[in-house]
Amino acid sequence: SMLALDMSPSPNNPNTRLDVVKEVIKEFINKRKYDRIGLVAFAVDPYLVSALTLDKEYLQSNLARLKVGLTEQTGTNIGSVLAEGINRLRPLESKSKILILLTDGKDEPPPKHSPLVYAEGAQKDKIKIYTIAIGASTRTRTYLYDPNARDIMRYANGTPVVEVAEYPVDKEILQEIAQRTDANFFEAGDKSTLRSIYDEIDQLEKTDIELEVNALYEDLYQWPLACGFIILILGFILEHSILLRIP
């Protein structure tokens, strides 16, 4: 499936792409009550935000603290974060093991190994990789980031410095990754579309769970076969620590 809508700037919508994505992912996490979910952000190297866990409160708190500038890396390496996610999922036994890769960038500089190499490995391990390209346009407004102040640059009056920059998304490679792992590629142009994408993935990857009536929440940790395992990968967050993109 492919979905595409406009994510053009609006003076009435000051939220950044990161704000929008975090809100939608928060809703998705709440729906997957009995699944262990992990969260990984990445630039050149992956950044583990949260290991696989059933503790949704812990996961949500780690999601909330995500911000641009957690790493001083610049560039993107999709293969490295796929390897991280696959390695965490490979040894686990579950009816459902999926990665959800969300990005608004492309590999830069060119990687030593194509992400498709890792996609083929995921397919052999029966791991599905759903891919989501964020943004309908390659041109987007950006905040300039000051690495010394660890904050966005501002004019003397406190107004953020905003520029327009070009950031193409490699949709072809994202589509190929999804196809090779029997998953789907999506394009999200606005918040409602992104929400519908996660809703669709939620429906596609429902796992049958049988629990005794008196089962306690803590007991779920002892029953990995009854749960799905999901790793959410957010590439655009740390992709360029110098630039924070907004819709």
Protein language model features and the residues they cover:
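…and closely analogous acidic/polar surface helices at protein-protein or active-site interfaces
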Residues: 2-37, 53-58
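Extracytoplasmic/secreted cell-surface and envelope-processing proteins
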Residues: 3-5, 48-50, 108-112, 138-142, ...
